[in-house]
């Protein structure tokens, strides 16, 4: 029914904007590029949507952007401003976000993706939404290089982007090891990777099966 279609579209839109990653669409390979691209773009916007909301909308309602940022964020941005003005902070974070995005898209292309897929998967990788454009997801490409790019940039995007800004400004990578959130993220990623490697069958076992 028409209402059912509206519900599905609303669910898909909110899933992308909140980077939830859930989808109600099937037959992703048959969807037009424009629709898949829009899904990925919404995810990419959602990846840094809090800053847009704080800087562009809330001040018009009489709510300071700095108030919601302090209430809703974690990491260095919660304790002190990265720049004197919130608008400048938003600009700095978006420059870093855009830089990571461009590097991710180029890396995907060098790993074997067409530019079309590289750009769309870049948007869902750096936003950590996981929205796919193929029913088989990354298995569609059957490429260890593509998988490696996804892993690296998901690890990078898992860090607080305000922390990336501080590392870039101070030129000191040890800042990552001084932040509790970053250390927890590194430890969790390392632990999960070790568990997956331990439980995954070896190439010899796969050949036997």
Stretches with model-predicted labels:
Residues 1-2, 6-206:
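Membrane-proximal intracellular helices of multi-pass ion channels
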